[in-house]
Amino acid sequence: MKLQEALSIFNEIYYRLKPHCEKIVVAGSIRRQKAEVRDIDIVLIPTNPGQLSQEIDRLGPPIADGEKLKQVEYNGTQVDIYYANQKTWATLLLIRTGSRENNIGLCSQAQSLGMKLKANGDGIIDAGGHLIPIESEEQIYQILGLPYHEPWERG
């Protein structure tokens, strides 16, 4: 589907889920502003998981229903909803925004520094095995010694 159509669908979902979220942001190819979009990726931090789950159930038929990922079909479009918390927010948003190639590059850079960028969005592990507190996507690039790239610059 075209980017504008995907944004319109995201906005419909956003206004339904926002009352139950501390944060909610579109990710994936929409956030990267790609002309063509396959599905809708959303990263959120719930304030009331029970009410949020009920509202997600009302969006459409479930595809997957996990603890960290819920997938539904909303008016014929697949919607992937990723659950974050304050500790995982920035890393999960970065990973779910992509692109795949960008994520591979970031993971390789982390590995070259003796660190591990968790592909599931759980954070960055330093050489000593400790989770590094992350506040923003910009900080991830800084820790990895790389210049920050806006989402639309990530391929």
Where are these regions (language model features)?
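Acidic, metal-coordinating catalytic segment for phosphate/diphosphate chemistry
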Residues: 2-5, 50-155
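Active-site nucleotide-donor binding segment shared across nucleotidyl transfer reactions
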Residues: 11-40, 44-51
